Amino acid sequence: MFAIIKTGGRQLKVEKDQTIFVEKIDKNEGETITFTDILFINGKIGTPYVENASVTGIIEKQGKAKKIVVYRHNPKSTHKRKLGHRQLFTKVKITELKG
């Protein structure tokens, strides 16, 4: 059994005991989180969401992804700019699919 959830502007296919990485969620490690924006579960397609359906998980880790380097250069002048960015993420282990 699997479900398709919507979180952080993305749609993810999840199954029980699967680990997923999502955009930063403001909760502490070890806390339980419930996703209620379920697009598909157990053969039911939502319009846009399936009613009385939820996916529960436990937050395993809060962290930052690897750094990406952004380099901007204007070839007609001496202007150049180098920036780094590290995206925040939350690691969630799915424990229950209900619906």
Curated annotation (Swiss-Prot):
InterPro entries: bL21-like, bL21-like_sf, Ribosomal_bL21
Record text on subunit structure and interactions: Part of the 50S ribosomal subunit. Contacts protein L20.
Record carries keyword RNA-binding: yes
Encoding gene, per UniProt annotation: rplU
Protein name from the UniProt record: Large ribosomal subunit protein bL21
Pfam families: Ribosomal_L21p
A GO CC term assigned to this protein in UniProt: ribonucleoprotein complex
Family: Belongs to the bacterial ribosomal protein bL21 family.
Source superkingdom: Bacteria
Molecular function (Gene Ontology), one example: rRNA binding
Keyword Ribonucleoprotein listed: yes
Keywords on record: Ribonucleoprotein, Ribosomal protein, RNA-binding, rRNA-binding
Gene Ontology BP, a term: translation
Free-text function comment from the UniProt entry: This protein binds to 23S rRNA in the presence of protein L20.
